[in-house]
């Protein structure tokens, strides 16, 4: 029995579960998706909260610029490029044997400075927020001060008496570990069995304590949370429930809005924007989607992408059970090459807060991630890790859906011809060359 019903009963009441348990790629367009004005209050946060987070990141820019010289050119603002990928779009169209109208772009969070993934947004933001709180409470900072003073020996001495811990499959741990260690905190990252060895090695090289588990992500988070709870001076970054992480991700939307405007891209009802977000536990894509809905309202359509073996958010929202259900409950093993998305139980906070704001959810097979990885490198010269390619099939999934979604949303041929499609590329620039070469070899072999 699974939450009071047999598997057959679940498959009868929710036919999509047959596809999920069969590990087949599928898409589900959310019949409960509602207008932004109606659904945004579900989140319990608003535009003022995002503005507060954005202002905090600006206050920290002088410190970031000093501590991480690679950010000096951007004035200490951690941001990624927006790239057109027309050759990749043509390759996708050829492979589908059909036109893919609209224009395809890629948001290269894979190339964010400091930790090379989307987690540099939420993870670093939460560490900075905690550092600011401590510095203000201890008289080290006054409102209006130059935050570059947080690079001082006095600041390091203060932070060294405090710990920061997190549970991670890899990328969140990298962003939090690197930032916390740089400030002087005692940093600990609790890593699941899925975490890549190079990510553990990189953290240790930064002086971060890495605690390894032979269990999955949810168990690593639970153990990390328990250990941190025993130390009053340790701040635990809770990927499943953190509002600070969520807001750090949400700031991305206002920056994307400026980049699109600079590129001459219109976004309105007649020029819709589709954004395809890889989803693990849900904090990153949830926060970004929340920001996007605040920035663009109903003109933006957000879809979450998950591996066929780790469809935790789709399963949680589809059944309405959210974090009460895991993929393992349905016999799905949560073993995927997309290590950043290898999560069996979704964030209950994100699932409930965002369930009327996300247009759809789809799954991607591991082999397909490798094929797309090789295609992107071949057509655009961009190298991403497998997780980061989950957004790439999104354009075809939207244009080929047969669930009445486009009709319900008023997405006719004219609007689709003027649409912008955006793959949110979540990581990859820090993958060691030998490992990346292995990914490419596998992808090319699968393409044949």
From Swiss-Prot:
Cofactor requirements of the protein: pyridoxal 5'-phosphate
Which residue positions does N6-(pyridoxal phosphate)lysine occur at? 119
Kindly give the Pfam families that the UniProt entry links to this protein. PALP
| Gene3D superfamilies recorded | 3.40.50.1100
Reaction(s) this enzyme catalyzes, per UniProt: D-serine = pyruvate + NH4(+)
- Annotated keywords: Lyase, Pyridoxal phosphate
Protein name, per record: Probable D-serine dehydratase
Which organism does this record belong to? Chromobacterium violaceum (strain ATCC 12472 / DSM 30191 / JCM 1249 / CCUG 213 / NBRC 12614 / NCIMB 9131 / NCTC 9757 / MK)
């Amino acid at each position: 029995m699974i939450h009071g019903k047999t598997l057959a009963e679940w498959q009868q009441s929710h036919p999509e579960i047959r596809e999920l348990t069969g590990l087949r790629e599928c898409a589900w367009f959310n019949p409960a998706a509602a207008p932004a004005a109606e659904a945004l209050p579900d989140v319990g946060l608003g535009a003022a909260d995002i503005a507060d987070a954005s202002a905090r990141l600006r206050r920290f820019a002088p410190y970031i610029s000093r501590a991480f010289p690679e950010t000096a050119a951007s004035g200490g603002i951690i941001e990624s490029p927006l790239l057109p990928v027309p050759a990749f779009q043509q390759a996708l169209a050829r492979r589908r044997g059909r036109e893919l109208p609209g224009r395809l772009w890629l948001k290269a969070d894979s190339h964010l400075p400091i930790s090379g993934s989307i987690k540099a947004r939420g993870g670093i933001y939460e560490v900075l927020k905690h550092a600011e709180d401590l510095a203000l409470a201890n008289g080290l900072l006054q409102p209006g001060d130059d935050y570059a003073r947080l690079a001082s020996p006095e600041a390091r001495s203060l932070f060294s008496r405090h710990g920061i811990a997190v549970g991670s499959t890899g990328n969140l741990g990298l962003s939090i570990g690197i930032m916390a260690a740089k400030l002087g905190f005692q940093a600990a990252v609790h890593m699941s069995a899925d975490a890549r060895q190079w990510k553990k090695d990189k953290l240790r090289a930064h002086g971060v304590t890495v605690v390894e588990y032979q269990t999955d992500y949810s168990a690593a988070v639970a153990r990390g949370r328990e250990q941190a709870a025993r130390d009053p001076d340790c701040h635990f970054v809770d990927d499943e429930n953190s509002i600070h992480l969520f807001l750090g991700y949400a700031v991305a939307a206002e920056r994307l809005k400026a980049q699109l405007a600079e590129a001459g891209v219109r976004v309105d009802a007649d020029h819709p924007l589709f954004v395809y977000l890889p989803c693990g536990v849900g904090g990153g894509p949830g926060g970004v989607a929340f920001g996007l809905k605040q920035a663009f309202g109903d003109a933006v359509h957000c879809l979450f992408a998950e591996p066929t073996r780790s469809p935790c958010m789709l399963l949680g929202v589809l059944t309405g059970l959210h974090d009460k259900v895991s993929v393992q409950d349905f016999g799905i093993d949560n073993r995927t090459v997309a290590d950043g998305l290898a999560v069996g139980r979704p964030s209950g906070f994100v699932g409930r807060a965002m369930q009327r704001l996300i247009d759809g959810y789809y799954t991607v097979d591991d082999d397909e991630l490798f094929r797309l990885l090789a295609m992107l490198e071949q057509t655009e010269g961009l190298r991403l890790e497998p997780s980061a390619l989950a957004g790439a099939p999104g354009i075809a999934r939207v244009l080929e859906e047969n669930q009445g979604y486009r009709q319900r949303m008023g997405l006719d041929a004219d609007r689709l011809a003027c649409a912008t499609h955006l793959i949110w590329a979540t990581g990859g620039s820090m993958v060691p060359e030998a490992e990346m070469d292995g990914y490419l070899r596998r992808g090319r072999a699968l393409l044949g």
